[in-house]
Amino acid sequence: MTQMNFTDRATRVAIIANGKYQSKRVASKLFAAFKHDPDFYLSKKDPDIVISIGGDGMLLSAFHMYEKQLDKVRFVGVHTGHLGFYTDYRDFEVDTLINNLKNDKGEQISYPILKVTITLEDGRVIRARALNESTIKRIEKTMVADVVINQVVFERFRGDGILVSTPTGSTAYNKSLGGAVLHPTIEALQLTEISSLNNRVYRTLGSSVIIPKKDAIEIVPKRVGVYTISIDNKTVHYKNVTKIEYSIDEKSINFVSTPSHTSFWERVNDAFIGEPEH
């Protein structure tokens, strides 16, 4: 008979917080609550649940920290500022969070993420995942690139760059560019132009395009040079990019399903509209 250690039965929890005072206070309270509770085991290396404390930026960092463990990790966010799109709890709801995790039945809410494949002229292939968005830009000169959707050349783009976002990322940079807001359960990508050049000679669609899950997007630069590619909040520079491919990843991000889950449209209202004046 194999003897079972209490850690085999306990829920393994990682607590990730930003450097703000209030976030540290919440983290300290959670550490103290979980440290001697047999239902939980603190494990930053191999967690079942990752608690992100801060804002949406902190959750993006937590996602990339555990993106190789997405099959077995669920996330939960605690916001120490105003309401965020990835957070279900406020800093004063720590006791509610602990109680809900004690009664957790393993249910989850899943959202699609972005698969990014960058091919360079020397044959190197760089693969990455994005929770919100990815952009490609050519800073010093106008970017010229073919936009290929599902192997069909859709347009030749001229402008500052192109953004591809997930539904959860549609409320971020995409919205500031005039893109549509998509509900996060929709498995689709959104392609949005960044300062496209439109005149009598050069034309682009000039509006966002919603791409279904089964289709892929290719951006094929037509000029040599250094390109700036962002993956969420990280930016890299590559010389002579042959193409960059975007599609819905086979994995998804999973959040702990909680009774206090705030609806997406409430979050949109809170972030961009607010209470009407009377």
UniProtKB/Swiss-Prot annotation:
The active site is at residue 56. Signal peptide: none annotated. It catalyses: NAD(+) + ATP = ADP + NADP(+) + H(+). One of its GO terms (cellular component) is cytoplasm. Its main location: cytoplasm. The keyword Transport does not apply. It comes from the Bacteria. Keywords: ATP-binding, Cytoplasm, Kinase, NAD, NADP, Nucleotide-binding, Transferase. Its cofactor is a divalent metal cation. NAD(+) binds at residues 56-57, 132-133, 158, 160, 171-176. InterPro entries: ATP-NAD_kinase_N, ATP-NAD_kinase_PpnK-typ_C, NAD/diacylglycerol_kinase_sf, NADK. GO terms for biological process: NAD metabolic process; NADP biosynthetic process. Pfam families: NAD_kinase, NAD_kinase_C. Its EC number is 2.7.1.23. GO terms for molecular function: ATP binding; metal ion binding; NAD binding; NAD+ kinase activity. It is found in: Cytoplasm. Involved in the regulation of the intracellular balance of NAD and NADP, and is a key enzyme in the biosynthesis of NADP. Catalyzes specifically the phosphorylation on 2'-hydroxyl of the adenosine moiety of NAD to yield NADP. Belongs to the NAD kinase family. This is NAD kinase. It comes from Streptococcus agalactiae serotype V (strain ATCC BAA-611 / 2603 V/R).
